[in-house]
Amino acid sequence: MSSSSGSAVNIAIVTLFPEMFAAITESGISRRAVEQGLVKLSFFNPRTYTTDKHQTVDDRPYGGGPGMVMRVEPLAKALLAAKQWHSEQRAEQALPNTAKETVIYMSPQGAQLNNQAVDTMAASGDFTIIAGRYEGVDQRFIDAFVDQEWSIGDYVLSGGELPAMVLIDALIRKLPGALGDAQSAEQDSFENGLLDCPHYTRPEELADAWQTSVDDRRVPAVLLSGDHKKIELWRLKQSLGRTWERRPDLLNKLDLDQSQRNLLTEYQQQKLSCSSSDD
């Protein structure tokens, strides 16, 4: 990503609803990344590039059917403006203008976004993200201009803005300096192919009023031990166990070493023992 050379990562967003992105420009880690100059965001509304008084960006689908389809011309003009913005940013940052930003369309028909894909994107440069609306975008625009299509899951949303924000937030977390602790990203779920381990904070024991069992009220003793090696092994075991219970498909993709297999076996045996004692 551009930030590795000390320059900002540039992300242009083509959207009919730029105001929705206040969720990432005004809050949390993404806001700080913008303020620190780690990432630059710019928004391009296709309505700005229409020529009729109604600012029409959609029309009925050929062949009939429900809904409306976003037209090529306003999208293409918005994308052209985004390309010009990218060129200006590269000039300001003294980057070679031979570089080409990746054009991404957020779509239920796209490949499913995962951590590996975000890692690959994070190493590839700048982006323009297309957030569609209505029944979708004229396929001719996709064929002519889009480099990649990505989905955030097997369900349909009202538009591409929320998926675009998901992608931007995931990318920002990969930027050096975006997180307060560099280890935060390294310990996220999926960074090592596993789900994250459980986390606890004060107090050490919850009050009886929470009506949980005694064991559930207390922080696991190993986390209070100060033994960093034991804590590391406990966290790895919990990650392995959680992944086995909740996402066994992820485990099938990993080549666990012997120590990891031993930890997983321990977890499984402990779970079996607890289940037997409950019967």
From Swiss-Prot:
One of the Pfam families matching this protein, by short name: tRNA_m1G_MT
Enzyme class: transferase
UniProt entry tagged with the keyword Transferase: yes
Function (record text): Specifically methylates guanosine-37 in various tRNAs.
Keyword Cytoplasm recorded: yes
Family that this chain belongs to: Belongs to the RNA methyltransferase TrmD family.
GO biological process: tRNA N1-guanine methylation
Primary localization: cytoplasm
Reaction equations catalysed: guanosine(37) in tRNA + S-adenosyl-L-methionine = N(1)-methylguanosine(37) in tRNA + S-adenosyl-L-homocysteine + H(+)
GO MF annotation, one: tRNA (guanine(37)-N1)-methyltransferase activity
GO cellular component: cytosol
HAMAP family, sorted: TrmD (MF_00605)
Subcellular location: Cytoplasm
Species annotation: Saccharophagus degradans (strain 2-40 / ATCC 43961 / DSM 17024)
Residues bound to S-adenosyl-L-methionine: G132, I152, G153, D154, Y155, V156, L157
Keyword terms, alphabetized: Cytoplasm, Methyltransferase, S-adenosyl-L-methionine, Transferase, tRNA processing
Protein name from the UniProt record: tRNA (guanine-N(1)-)-methyltransferase
E.C. no: 2.1.1.228
Cross-referenced CDD domains: TrmD-like (cd18080)
Assembly information from the UniProt record: Homodimer.
